[in-house]
């Protein structure tokens, strides 16, 4: 964590590499919660103004609040009062804007789940470094972006450092889903409703009436509704349709197996 006197790195540069962007992010997201907010946000805005003007320390002028408000209206796309990583990528001149490149490839939660299914080749519930590298390679090809092996390696390591919250060198589904725009990230809706393995097994067994080891989309509908009602949360038909479509992207021929649903609903991916 950066000390209060440490100068923010790289804000003055005309273009940032992926690694430099990450250093800026880690400097200002001091508590590591995935957002720049509150005092962190004020500090970021002041330092950004200072870097852009090339002036001395900025004093808090009368119009600081108004300038901050305009800044947030421009860049806080989902109006939650916080800056997330992809919003920061819009503010700073990031080289080849690799985060936006991701989002063009997995623009919806259903596409994201399909990509997850493709690259979680061993069905472990994680994408490991070698699998992530393949994911990024395909991504860059789709976007017609030239790259060499060192650049691909840099992107792989940078994405790991960005999203690998527990530092184990691999990305779980909830970590990887932070690549999605917040409004598309249906997995965020399940935060606070994560099940233990015992709870998950009980609810899956209840809906898998014939003990086949999988459920279909109608049974998934009922399961999701049940989960929301038990947690006293509301879900409309449109949300239910979106969540079902996203989760069913993990299914095989309309069959959603226990292990795949467990990745979405459990606190920890299956062992």
UniProtKB/Swiss-Prot annotation:
- What is this protein called in UniProt? Calretinin
Q: Which UniProt keywords apply?
A: Calcium, Cell projection, Metal-binding, Phosphoprotein, Repeat, Synapse
The chain positions of domain EF-hand read: 16-51, 63-98, 107-142, 151-186, 195-230, 235-270
Where is this chain primarily localised?
Answer: other
Residues that coordinate or bind Ca(2+) 4:
164, 166, 168, 170, 175
Its BP terms in the Gene Ontology are: intracellular calcium ion homeostasis; regulation of synaptic plasticity; synaptic signaling
Q: Where in the cell is it found?
A: Synapse; Cell projection, Dendrite
Query: What gene is it encoded by?
Result: Calb2
User: Do you know which InterPro entries this protein is assigned to?
Assistant: CALB2, Calbindin_Ca-bind, EF-hand-dom_pair, EF_Hand_1_Ca_BS, EF_hand_dom
Q: What function does this protein fulfil?
A: Calcium-binding protein involved in calcium homeostasis and signal transduction. It plays a critical role in buffering intracellular calcium levels and modulating calcium-dependent signaling pathways. Predominantly expressed in specific neuronal populations, influences synaptic plasticity and neuronal excitability, contributing to learning and memory. During embryonic development, it facilitates neuronal differentiation and maturation.
GO molecular function ontology, one term from the record: calcium ion binding
Q: Which residues of the sequence carry a binding annotation for Ca(2+) 1?
A: 29, 31, 33, 35, 40
Recorded GO cellular component terms are: cuticular plate; cytosol; dendriole; dendrite; gap junction; nucleus; parallel fiber to Purkinje cell synapse; stereocilium
């Amino acid at each position: 964590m950066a000390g209060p006197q440490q100068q923010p790195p790289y804000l003055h540069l005309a273009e940032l590499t992926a690694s430099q962007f990450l250093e800026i992010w880690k400097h200002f997201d001091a508590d590591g919660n995935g957002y720049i907010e509150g005092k962190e946000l004020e500090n970021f805005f002041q330092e950004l103004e200072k870097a852009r003007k090339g002036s001395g320390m900025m004093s808090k002028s009368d119009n600081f609040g108004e300038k901050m408000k305009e800044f947030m209206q421009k860049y806080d796309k989902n109006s939650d009062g916080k800056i997330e990583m992809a919003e920061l990528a819009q503010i700073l001149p990031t080289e080849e804007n690799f985060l936006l490149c991701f989002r063009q490839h997995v623009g919806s939660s259903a596409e994201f789940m399909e990509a997850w299914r493709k690259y979680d080749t061993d069905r472990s519930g994680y994408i490991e470094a070698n699998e992530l590298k393949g994911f990024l390679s395909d991504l860059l090809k789709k976007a017609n972006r030239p790259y060499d092996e060192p650049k691909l390696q840099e992107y792989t390591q940078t994405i790991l450092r960005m999203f690998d919250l527990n530092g184990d060198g691999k990305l779980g589904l909830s970590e990887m889903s932070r690549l999605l725009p917040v409004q598309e990230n249906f997995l965020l809706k399940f935060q606070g409703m994560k099940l233990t393995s015992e709870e998950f097994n009980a609810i899956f067994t209840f809906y898998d009436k014939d003990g086949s080891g999988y459920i279909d989309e109608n049974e998934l509908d009922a399961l999701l509704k049940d989960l929301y009602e038990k947690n006293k949360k509301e879900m409309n038909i449109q949300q239910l349709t979106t969540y079902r479509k996203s989760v069913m992207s993990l299914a095989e021929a309309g069959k959603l197996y226990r292990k795949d649903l467990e990745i979405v609903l459990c606190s920890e991916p299956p062992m």
